[in-house]
Amino acid sequence: MSERAPVVTIDGPSGAGKGTISQLLAQHLGWQLLDSGAIYRVLALAAIHHDVELENEESITLLAAHLDVKFLTGNDKDPVQVILEGEDVTTDIRTQECSNAASKVAAFPRVREALLRRQRAFRTAPGLIADGRDMGTVVFPTAPAKLYLTASAEERAQRRYNQLQDKGFDVNIERLLSEIIERDERDMNRPVAPLVPAEDAFVIDTSGKGIDEVLELALKYINEKLSSAN
């Protein structure tokens, strides 16, 4: 890992626009991209592919330490393209089987430690955009620029509703809103790495804002921070 390679962390709750803004920033700056929210799913899928028992902490930890994963800028449908061992698994990691397996492997402390090191290894020249929930507080606490994107639960539910409708799913917006509120409560009050802005994070409320406006605010902040750091 190069400590001199700059890193911009982007944290916040689901539906706040982290994925889209991370993709656009990575494209604009020509930097590496890390989607930390997908990494446990990727590890779970790798375990399934290699017939590794999900209950075997030692084997899963070894797999985590050598996980061959890349995150590329994607498209409007999937802002981040996930590549595992040279194969596009963007859709594969979203299955219920993969989700269930991810919950199992994430329960192992040694696996979490191995993936923490693996995530930090993404910090290479020319720079890194790190998208997640604890990037600025746990994974890259010394990052020179930290963003925290948020939005009202109602707006995030509407965005998620629109996304699922576009993909042909029949969804109930009231249920989505309830799930988002419950997840926020759980994430913000968990004892380990709770979802909170870093003390030195620049908070952007994306409610009622278009992508271009949020991107402009983010770039202005990042340029100011990186200029003062040099």
From Swiss-Prot:
* Localization (cell): Cytoplasm
> Which EC number applies?
2.7.4.25
Q: Name one Pfam family in it.
A: Cytidylate_kin
Which keywords, in A-to-Z order, does the entry hold?
ATP-binding, Cytoplasm, Kinase, Nucleotide-binding, Transferase
As its record notes, the protein acts as a catalyst of: CMP + ATP = CDP + ADP; dCMP + ATP = dCDP + ADP
- List ligand-binding residues for ATP: G12, P13, S14, G15, A16, G17, K18, G19, T20
* Primary location class: cytoplasm
Recorded GO cellular component terms are: cytosol
Mind telling me what this protein is named? Cytidylate kinase
